[in-house]
A protein has these predicted regions:
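Polar, glycine-rich mid-to-C-terminal structural blocks
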Residues: 160, 172, 177-179, 183-249
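A generic structural motif
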Residues: 31-35, 207, 251
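Cleft-lining beta-strand/loop regions that shape enzyme active-site pockets
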Residues: 4-195
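Short clusters of small/polar residues that mark proteolytic maturation junctions
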Residues: 10, 43, 128, 203, ...
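Conserved functional hotspot residues or short segments at active or partner-binding sites
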Residues: 213-214, 218-366
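Short, solvent-exposed loop/turn elements at domain surfaces
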Residues: 50-52, 73-77, 209-210, 258-260, ...
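Glycine-rich active-site/cofactor-binding loop and its immediate structural neighborhood
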Residues: 1
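A sequence-level detector of short linear motifs
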Residues: 7, 40, 200, 215, ...
């Protein structure tokens, strides 16, 4: 980095990051070792946009799909741009994927919820021991009130994502599909001290419009082990094993029963699929073979990938080059990893969409 050699010096990652950062418009010299070859780079420092929408495309003629990874300050803007493109393409239904979305900006969750709800529909409210109830309702000016919506959630869906899912469910606006969400619904306020430090104090909790508390309980000191215990108790694979607090019974706008006790319980349960995680898949994950393969494909097909601008073209190109054969050859050559008889047939439908997605991120496709 610059004139300093850091390879082999055990330089901490945060120190390397500080060395590479600097005023916008200035340059930093890097020497990168790629596949055994040292390659020099002169990089101009600038703001790097981090997008929150991982994917937005039409599944068929009338169904759109959007994957939202986090709620950032630009989420609403990105979401509006994505839905505008999908509406122009004929979208009548939307699959909104909030799996593993840990939340983020509260106001963005409110604005996204508002897009789907009628005037005065409840979105969420907050209330605490020393904090009076504060309601947040829709204003009816959303542009997606007539779009059918299905929301995908899982145990990694938390905070702002749960606010959105709870609002959709309690207003009977759409269908929630997946597994019980994380259960993170605390309202915290920062208190700053004169020495520059600070502390965040919990002052209230978030509740869905029907009155369900999103925050899961802290009982038995098992808060940090909750997800592990869900696996152990079979909740991830069987709806019958899902813990439901039957005493915390609430009703949606149309009178459907919903239960509190922490997190959002889906309308349609989808078990986690463990049958496709073969030993070959697990070993590839441990060594990040999929990510390194994607980078190698970019190096090899940089010219082609840089011209692909739509999903159909990307899919046709991937089919034409036999991506499966390329990946299996790469795994065997670089890590001596080969699927046992029958393993690839089991795991191919699990691995290849991930691999194609990683390669596709190097294209010009939004």
């Amino acid at each position: 980095v610059g004139e300093r050699v850091i390879a082999g010096t055990k330089t901490p990652q945060d120190s390397m990051v500080r060395m590479m950062k600097g005023p916008k418009g200035t340059k930093v010299k890097l020497l990168i070792n790629r596949s055994g070859t040292d390659i020099p780079f002169d990089i101009t420092r600038d703001k790097i946009p981090v997008h929150c929408i991982d994917a937005a495309f039409m599944v068929n003629d009338t169904t759109g799909y959007i994957k939202l990874s986090k709620f950032t300050r630009t989420t609403y803007k990105e979401f509006k741009e994505a839905t505008s493109r999908l509406l122009d393409a004929g979208m009548k239904r939307l699959v909104f994927d909030l799996r593993d979305n840990s939340g983020g900006y509260f106001d963005q969750a409110l604005m996204l919820s508002n897009e789907f709800l009628q005037n005065k529909d409840g979105i969420v409210y907050m209330e605490g021991l020393h904090r009076p109830r504060q309601n947040y309702d829709a204003d009816g000016r959303g542009s997606l009130k007539d779009i059918q919506i299905s929301v995908l959630i899982d145990e990694g869906t938390a905070s702002s994502s749960e606010i959105f899912a709870g609002a959709i469910q309690d207003n009977d606006r759409g269908v929630i599909v997946g597994r019980r969400s994380f259960g993170k619904g605390l309202v915290q306020e920062p208190i700053n001290f004169t020495d520059g430090s600070g502390v965040r104090v919990t002052v209230a909790r978030f509740y869905t419009p029907s009155g369900r508390c999103i925050q899961k309980p802290y009982d038995k000191n098992n808060y940090q082990y909750d997800i592990y215990e869900r696996y152990a108790h079979g909740e991830m694979t069987s709806a019958d094993s899902m813990k439901v607090d039957t005493t915390a019974l609430f009703y949606t706008v149309k009178g459907r029963r919903v239960y509190g006790g922490g997190g959002i319980i889906p309308d349609i349960f989808v078990p986690i699929d463990t049958t496709l995680a073969t030993k070959f898949y697990i070993n590839c994950n441990k060594k990040a073979v999929q990510m390194r393969f994607a980078a190698s494909m970019f190096d090899r097909y940089r010219g082609v990938l840089s011209t692909i601008e739509d999903f159909s073209s990307l899919d046709r190109w991937m089919s034409s080059i036999d991506m499966e054969a390329h990946f299996l050859e790469y795994a065997a050559r670089t890590e001596n990893l080969r699927p046992a008889p029958g393993e690839w047939e089991k795991t191919v439908s699990y691995m290849m969409p991930q691999i194609k997605a990683l390669v596709g991120r190097y294209s010009k496709l939004d």
